[in-house]
C-alpha cells in the first residue's frame, strides 16, 4: 500500500498540492481523476520520486520512501511518464530491455531476457519485436513503452496519462492489460486518466483531486456518483448502469455548459 500524509508542494507563490492525505490499496488499480491543474501528475511524480515535495510524507508498505535507496526503489516502483520520448533509434525489444536496467545495469542475464520476452508476449507485441519505434503507430509505441515498464517486474506501476492521444482500440487494450496485471499478478497500478468512463469501468479505487487538494477517494461506487462528478468537473452528469458497466454522460445537446 502507498500512503500519502499531509503532502504539499509549492512553486513560488503557487500551491500545486495542499496537505493531501490518501491511500492507494495494494493489488488494485487506482485512477487519479480531476480537472486540469488539479495536482494529479504532481502527486504521481512525487510518489515516483521524480519530484521533491515541500511537506508531508509518502510511505511504501509502511516505510518512508525517502529512507529507501533509489536503486532499491526502482525494483519496487516503475514509472511511465506522459508521452515518453527516446531520441535513440531502438527496436521494441531494445526498448523493453531498458526495463531491466535496475537489475542488469546494462549487462543482460538469462533472467533478464526471459523477463523481456514475457513482457512482449503479455502485450502481444511479438510480431513487432524487431520493429523500430519510429515505424510504429502511436498506440503500438505506447504498448511498447508499457512493456518496458512491465519488464521491470515491480510490485507497483505508476502511469501518467497512458491513454493520451490513443484511439479507442489501443486505449482499451492498455486498460485491459493493466487490469490483468492486477487480477492475475497482484500488481498495484496507479494511473492518471482523463477519460472518466475508463476510470469508472476499469478501476477498483478512485482518487479525485481538485485545485491541488484531495476532493474524495474510495471505491468506484462511492466516487463515481452524479453529485460528486458534477461538483468535481462543473458539468451536469448522468450515470447509467448496464451489464457492460457504467456510462458517465456529460454531453448536452445544446452544447452549453451546465
Region spans (language model):
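The feature captures the beta-strand-to-loop junction immediately N-terminal to the Walker
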Residues: 33-35
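Helix-to-loop junction immediately C-terminal to a conserved catalytic motif
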Residues: 48
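Conserved ABC transporter NBD signature motif
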Residues: 56-64, 73
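Conserved ABC ATPase "signature" region
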Residues: 97, 110-128, 153, 158
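Conserved ABC ATPase signature
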Residues: 132-136, 140
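ABC ATPase nucleotide-binding domains
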Residues: 233-258
Amino acid at each position: 500500500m502507498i500512503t500519502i500524509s499531509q503532502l504539499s508542494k509549492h512553486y513560488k507563490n503557487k500551491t500545486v498540492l495542499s496537505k493531501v492525505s490518501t491511500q492507494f490499496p495494494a493489488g488494485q488499480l487506482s485512477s487519479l481523476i480531476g480537472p486540469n491543474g488539479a495536482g494529479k501528475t504532481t502527486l504521481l511524480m512525487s510518489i515516483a520520486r521524480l519530484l521533491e515535495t515541500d511537506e508531508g510524507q509518502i510511505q511504501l508498505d509502511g516505510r518512508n520512501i525517502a529512507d529507501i535507496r533509489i536503486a532499491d526503489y526502482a525494483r519496487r516502483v516503475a514509472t511511465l511518464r506522459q508521452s515518453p520520448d527516446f531520441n535513440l533509434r531502438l527496436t521494441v525489444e531494445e526498448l523493453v530491455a531498458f526495463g531491466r536496467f535496475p537489475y542488469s545495469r546494462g549487462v543482460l542475464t538469462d533472467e533478464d531476457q526471459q523477463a523481456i520476452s514475457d513482457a512482449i508476449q503479455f502485450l502481444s507485441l511479438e510480431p513487432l519485436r524487431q520493429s523500430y519505434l519510429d515505424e510504429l503507430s502511436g498506440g503500438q509505441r505506447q504498448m511498447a513503452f508499457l512493456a518496458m515498464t512491465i519488464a521491470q517486474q515491480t510490485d507497483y506501476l505508476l502511469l501518467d496519462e497512458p491513454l493520451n492521444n490513443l484511439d479507442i482500440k489501443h486505449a482499451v487494450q492498455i486498460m485491459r492489460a493493466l487490469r490483468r496485471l492486477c487480477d492475475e499478478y497482484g500488481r498495484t497500478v496507479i494511473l492518471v486518466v482523463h477519460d472518466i468512463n475508463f476510470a469508472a469501468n476499469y478501476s477498483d479505487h478512485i482518487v479525485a483531486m481538485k485545485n491541488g487538494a484531495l476532493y474524495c477517494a474510495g471505491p468506484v461506487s462511492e466516487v463515481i456518483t452524479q453529485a460528486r462528478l458534477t461538483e468535481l468537473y462543473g458539468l451536469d452528469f448522468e450515470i447509467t448502469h448496464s451489464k457492460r458497466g457504467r456510462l458517465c454522460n456529460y454531453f448536452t445537446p445544446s452544447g452549453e455548459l451546465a
